[in-house]
Amino acid sequence: MIQVLLVTICLAAFPYQGSSIILESGNVNDYEIVYPRKVTALPKGAVQPKYEDAMQYELKVNGEPVVLHLEKNKQLFSKDYSETHYSPDGREITTYPLVEDHCYYHGRIENDADSTASISACNGLKGHFKLQGEMYLIEPLKLSDSEAHAVYKYENVEKEDEAPKMCGVTQNWKSYEPIKKASQLVVTAEHQKYNPFRFVELVLVVDKAMVTKNNGDLDKIKTRMYELANTVNDIYRYMYIHVALVGLEIWSNEDKITVKPEADYTLNAFGEWRKTDLLTRKKHDNAQLLTAIDLDRVIGLAYVGSMCHPKRSTGIIQDYSPINLVVAVIMAHEMGHNLGINHDRGYCSCGDYACIMRPEISPEPSTFFSNCSYFDCWDFITNHNPECIVNEPLGTDIISPPVCGNELLEVGEECDCGTPENCQNECCDAATCKLKSGSQCGHGDCCEQCKFSKSGTECRASMSECDPAEHCTGQSSECPADVFHKNGQPCLDNYGYNGNCPIMYHQCYDLFGADVYEAEDSCFERNQKGNYYGYCRKENGNKIPCAPEDVKCGRLYCKDNSPGQNNSCKMFYSNEDEHKGMVLPGTKCADGKVCSNGHCVDVATAY
């Protein structure tokens, strides 16, 4: 059973009206002083752990008593979490810290359904909580009285520069303007059933300018990165995505790329470094670079719809503010682009709050994604299937003892539907994480009304001729593993590849819409140029022209017959995403041949 501590925070309001104080977050002109006093409720003689799994804090805010519930974020670090920095002579130093007993928590305010909290309890209480729609920050005061803390609103932190701060992404990944029904999107239980949690394994990279900004204090940098990751993890829980920190790399001696104010240049260089260096020594899904360099006119930039891509599953973030919440929201925004989320359009809504995916930072940083963001994200996940984020960590991989109520099925649990207040699973006893009497299951695509679905019930639909449907066995709540026909099997006058049937007509449709078809063979001869758009593959950064027999394995060309168009050799090219618009692997390029690594090869030898 989780041992809960009750800590009473007594508020003593010092005379501060008209005064200000300099905190880590900046100059604050209106604040309260609070004194946390810990009152344990552990059994007599019990050994108190350094950082409890769950805690409650009772305090007064604006004269009203509130109870803050906190639970240790057990999904913050992966089992194989590592940290890398460099000696003055450039030697790589990688360690694997013990992070089981960490001090980072998520939480909520009792009787406030819209409340959130992200708190570090390492040295006092530091972080933020939302109460009755308003964001409060809390941090220890550096006074001789070590128990003194300041509580204040974000709006009371003086801003050095009031000019709007923008994200550098200027184009949507896809146009969803016709789909304004997204503004009425409702997340149903059935929708959730077929959209389980995804898991993003994140590496944070800190540049040399950040090290200099922090006077070379690597421990200070690490603490800040943990706090940022804790908040990003909390934000994405509401998108059914777990973000786990699997690695931290600090460029302590020198930058491994040239970090320039030009965001496009820096993002491209960082992506190439991730592909050729970081991925070869650290398994992960996504990498974000934090820099203290002032980026020209923007505070962040990322590739859109690129999660799991070796180069483009990346973003860059300017360390724009000393307030962790602000930088964490920027990071969540840029990672959102990687997950296919566009900037919010005029009809998107977060209720009464600002939205994370606004093109510019809102006057108060938001922790909410809009209905459009949810639609964009899950449209990308469903239709483009970024496979790297599907792998759910096994219960035995969880680095800390299991915690009932964290919505993650762990060793010894039959189900986990969250806290008793939030559980909506009629099959699961939220207090014990055991199935209720008479229930066979509490989750899974083959679980209906707490019973195993009948044998033969379809649980995963066929996506193409190469991907047969899966059916329930009648003996398990889980749908059998997704299998597909062997690569190279005939389908739609083409050949199957990883469960899909990649024909050029479909690829043209995805790029340009209806009434667009595969172009004549003569158009593909342009791929022999080896110029910025016409090539077959890249080697060491150089674009390699197609050999005559390989021209249909380079840039895709389409014939546009849509109204008002008469383009017989239409192609797509973007500096931000050079790979988009290339013929997909496995596409038929001649009778009995398919595209593989920019070559048109015999289907019998391709797989």
From Swiss-Prot:
The keyword Glycoprotein applies. Residues 1-20 form the signal peptide. A motif (D/ECD-tripeptide) lies at residues 465-467. Residues 401-487 form the Disintegrin domain. Ca(2+) 3 binds at D467, P468, E470, D482, V483. One of its GO terms (molecular function) is metallopeptidase activity. Disulfide bonds join C308-C388, C348-C372, C350-C355, C404-C433, C415-C428, C417-C423, C427-C450, C441-C447, C446-C472, C459-C479, C491-C501, C508-C558, C523-C569, C536-C546, C553-C595, C589-C600. Ca(2+) 1 binds at E201, D285, C388, N391. Residues 459-472 are annotated as: Inhibits platelet aggregation. It comes from the Eukaryota. Zn(2+) binds at H333, H337, H343. InterPro entries: ADAM_Cys-rich, Disintegrin_CS, Disintegrin_dom, Disintegrin_dom_sf, MetalloPept_cat_dom_sf, Peptidase_M12B, Peptidase_M12B_N, Reprolysin_adamalysin. Its main location: secreted. One of its GO terms (cellular component) is plasma membrane. Residues 198-393 form the Peptidase M12B domain. Its EC number is 3.4.24.-. Keywords: Calcium, Disulfide bond, Glycoprotein, Hemorrhagic toxin, Hemostasis impairing toxin, Hydrolase, Metal-binding, Metalloprotease, Platelet aggregation inhibiting toxin, Protease, Pyrrolidone carboxylic acid, Secreted, Signal, Toxin, Zinc. Glycans are attached at N371, N566. Expressed by the venom gland. The modification Pyrrolidone carboxylic acid (Glu) is found at E190. Its cofactor is Zn(2+). Binds 1 zinc ion per subunit. SUPFAM superfamilies: Blood coagulation inhibitor (disintegrin), Metalloproteases ('zincins'), catalytic domain. Is implied in permanent muscle damage by attacking the collagen scaffold and other important basement membrane proteins of muscle, and by preventing muscle regeneration through disrupting the functions of satellite cells. Displays collagenolytic activity, fibrinogenolytic activity (on both Aalpha and Bbeta, but not gamma chains) and inhibits CRP-XL-induced platelet aggregation. In vivo, induces hemorrhage and fluctuations in muscle size by intramuscular injection into mice. Also induces apoptosis in endothelial cells, without triggering cell detachment. Monomer or heterodimer of VAP2A and VAP2B; non-covalently linked. This is Zinc metalloproteinase-disintegrin-like VAP2A.
